[in-house]
């Protein structure tokens, strides 16, 4: 269902907010600016949203590999690649994960065909010779710089997570990214002995019955952008 134009929030919200939000997903006046067709734009952006239920159709190893093979091409600072993915498939591993999820996220995490735990590697700079071979010596810039590496790892890991969600959609699946969990508990459970910091958990699969909440408003272009 497409809802066009501005939402009227005069009752629950101050009227000055109305001009700043909309859920217009038709964008007819920008149609000539896109190189992707409408179906592709809907798949990736306009009709895509967080899935909360899934069918029991299995997510294959081939699909998981395909997701990463797209994710890895997204740009990052200095081509660093701090994202690490833990696929939680087995019932035993899923049970261990669920106990670290917030109450509202437990049932859907337990039921999803596949769950990905996304983390960033705090020692990502060790791979400089692989991802920056023409200037591998720059690894030394980050030796002993724990705080700087953590900031860069988190920032670029989150950026890679956005590519990851798009890649999930590209293989015909739906993503349900979540932030309600005990990150330290998940790290102790799955990343002991590794330099990884969990920052997102993503349920993956074919969307099930009543998978979507209604589309919430998005801030308008004129409110978000400035030209200088």
Protein language model annotation of sequence segments:
Residues 6-9, 13-228:
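Acidic, surface-exposed loops and disordered segments
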């Amino acid at each position: 269902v497409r809802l066009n134009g501005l939402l009227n929030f005069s009752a629950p919200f101050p009227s000055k907010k109305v001009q700043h939000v909309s859920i217009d997903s038709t964008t007819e006046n920008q149609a000539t600016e896109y190189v992707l067709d409408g179906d592709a734009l809907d798949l990736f952006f306009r009709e895509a949203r967080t899935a909360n239920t899934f069918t029991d159709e299995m997510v294959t190893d081939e699909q998981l590999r395909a997701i990463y093979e797209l994710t890895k091409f997204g740009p990052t600072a200095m081509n660093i690649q701090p994202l690490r993915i833990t696929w939680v498939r087995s019932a035993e591993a899923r049970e261990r994960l669920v106990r670290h999820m917030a109450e509202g996220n437990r049932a859907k995490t337990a039921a999803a065909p596949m769950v990905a735990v996304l983390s960033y590697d705090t020692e990502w700079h060790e791979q400089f010779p692989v991802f920056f071979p023409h200037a591998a010596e720059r690894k030394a810039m980050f030796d002993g710089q724990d705080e700087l590496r953590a900031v860069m790892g988190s920032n670029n890991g989150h950026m890679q997570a956005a590519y990851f969600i798009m890649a999930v959609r590209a293989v015909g699946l739906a993503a349900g990214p979540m932030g309600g969990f005990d990150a330290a508990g998940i790290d102790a459970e799955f990343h002991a002995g590794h330099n990884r910091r969990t920052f997102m958990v993503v349920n993956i699969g074919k969307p099930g019955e009543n998978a979507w909440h209604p589309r919430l408003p998005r801030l308008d272009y004129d409110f978000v952008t400035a030209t200088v």
